[in-house]
Amino acid sequence: MKKLVFALLLTVMVAFASAAQTREIYTNNNFRTLAQSHKMLAIMPFAVKLQLRPKEVEKNGGAEGVAKLEEREGLDVQQALHSYFLKQKESNDLTVEVQDPARTNALLAQAGLTASQLATKTPEQLAQLLGVDGIISGSFSSTQPMSNGAAVAMNLVVGMSAPTNTGKLVINIHDGKAGELLWKYDKSLSRGFGSDTNTIVTTIMRKASRQFPYSKEFKG
């Protein structure tokens, strides 16, 4: 009897965890139609908001220093995502190319666009400027920078046993022609140690690999 109860409880917990993971990810019902001709995507520098304590703000050079740190963090996430996609491409598990961030950022700079000004442009405008078919953008908010070693671990946040969140990473993909949101991944993060930006981004993306629409594993 106890074994039966345990088995039923385990089944419910697995189902709950799966449902929680699904809620974190949105895929446009018309994805295949909108993205069927996509060949190249570009990753924007991420918008980062660090909610640091007063002493940490002072340690990082005040508000101006924190702003510079946030900008660096945004570039780190951009680069980490690109590195992840390169590995997927090498494994023959990615159906599109991803523009080198160096080219992306150079074109943005030539157009006079700083990271803080990206939100003033539509996905269509950015795609035309960069010569790509889709735009990957997003945001990261946390009480700790990802790149300083006091990192954030990637524990799945589910139900009653959920750990205290210390941040959130949101990844969006928009179509470059219609501007429609094609895919969104909204991931809460929990406190941990020993991880850097690449490790965090890779772990997060692996959790969503089968639901990433440009992956050959995608069944949607």
Segments from the language model and where they lie:
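Positively charged n-region of N-terminal signal peptides that target proteins for export
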Residues: 1-5
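Residues at beta-strand starts and edge strands
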Residues: 6, 134, 163-167
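Bacterial N-terminal signal peptides
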Residues: 7-15
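Short, flexible active-site loop motifs that bind/organize anionic cofactors or intermediates
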Residues: 10, 116, 169
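Sec/Tat signal peptide C-region and signal peptidase I cleavage site
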Residues: 16-20
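C-terminal/domain-edge helix-coil "capping" segments
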Residues: 21-52, 129, 140-151, 158-220
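N-terminal segment of the mature soluble domain
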Residues: 47-137, 176-187, 207, 211
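Charged helix-capping and loop-helix junction motifs
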Residues: 120, 153-156
